[in-house]
Amino acid sequence: MKVAVLGAAGGIGQALALLLKTQLPAGSKLSLYDIAPVTPGVAVDLSHIPTAVEIKGFAGEDPTPALVGADVVLISAGVARKPGMDRSDLFNINAGIVRNLIEKVAVTCPKALVGIITNPVNTTVAIAAEVMKKAGVYDKNRLFGVTTLDVIRSETFIAELKGLNVADVKINVIGGHSGVTILPLLSQVEGVTFSDEEVASLTKRIQNAGTEVVEAKAGGGSATLSMGQAACRFGMSLVRGLQGEANVVECAYVDGGSEHAEFFAQPVLLGKNGIEKVLPYGEVSAFEANARDSMLDTLKGDIKLGVDFVK
């Protein structure tokens, strides 16, 4: 099993690489790529951790050496949010970065499962799909927008609010990965009920959690450590699916034939081909149905931005 992290010298990438070095199955290979010259050194640093995961780092303009033979590619390259920016402000820089990296993935490891972390995810996933279509290698079951951070935040905030063991909290988060497009299905959480006020405030907190971190770091960064953990959870689920483990389910932003939009975050069953099955997200409350329907114009606009960028 080989996993490649593109953008491995950044805040998310380093946290993700550390977690993968400690969690990947014995005998796995982990390859780190970043444009930054420090990247081989990050790999040397991590190589001192005593786990049976072979690690190599590559720097420079071309990610190809890191991608050869990759089964899973996780892309966190790009610029991070600063105070006053929203995820769409990142588009101008990150769109080109994702396009260039995916062009290399399409040539070097077209069958790899690709998880896009780089924001704005609603748009960068559409860019990746268009690039792969142009290259003639697009497989909608192998491309994912990583929305796991919305899920782990939901789990954490629900457990805090209701005094639950966070390990017992399970929730689907649907839609997209920014602002109003993030929709936690609180009505489905088992064993708890929320007042209308709690639903409204919790939904808003989950949607704005990224901004909460950006502001708390006072210009010193964005949500890198929690995103590293979220990306590791999703990456490990991809690996477990590839290894044939049964019933591996995660929410992800995918081209899953949704009635709502071309790309939509919802639960998917993972396996040897990536997405084995897109799962229904279940019954929703009136509040959730309204929130879902009113986000769709925003989501579709984000997707169109990505499609138009490549065309």
Curated annotation (Swiss-Prot):
Keyword Membrane: no
Active site: H177 (proton acceptor)
Keywords on record: NAD, Oxidoreductase, Tricarboxylic acid cycle
InterPro entries, alphabetized: L-lactate/malate_DH (IPR001557), Lactate/malate_DH_C (IPR022383), Lactate/malate_DH_N (IPR001236), Lactate_DH/Glyco_Ohase_4_C (IPR015955), Malate_DH_AS (IPR001252), Malate_DH_type1 (IPR010097), Malate_DH_type1_bac (IPR023958), NAD(P)-bd_dom_sf (IPR036291)
Binding site for substrate: R81, R87, N119, R153
E.C. number(s) listed in UniProt: 1.1.1.37
Class of this enzyme: oxidoreductase
GO molecular function, one term: L-malate dehydrogenase (NAD+) activity
Annotated Pfam families: Ldh_1_C (PF02866), Ldh_1_N (PF00056)
Reaction catalysed by this enzyme: (S)-malate + NAD(+) = oxaloacetate + NADH + H(+)
Residues binding NAD(+): G7, A8, A9, G10, G11, I12, G13, D34, N94, I117, T118, N119, M227
Entry's Gene Ontology cellular component terms: cytoplasm
Any GO BP: tricarboxylic acid cycle
Assembly behavior: Homodimer.
Summary of the function given for this chain in its UniProt record: Catalyzes the reversible oxidation of malate to oxaloacetate.
Family: Belongs to the LDH/MDH superfamily. MDH type 1 family.
Listed name of the protein: Malate dehydrogenase
Organism: Shewanella oneidensis (strain ATCC 700550 / JCM 31522 / CIP 106686 / LMG 19005 / NCIMB 14063 / MR-1)
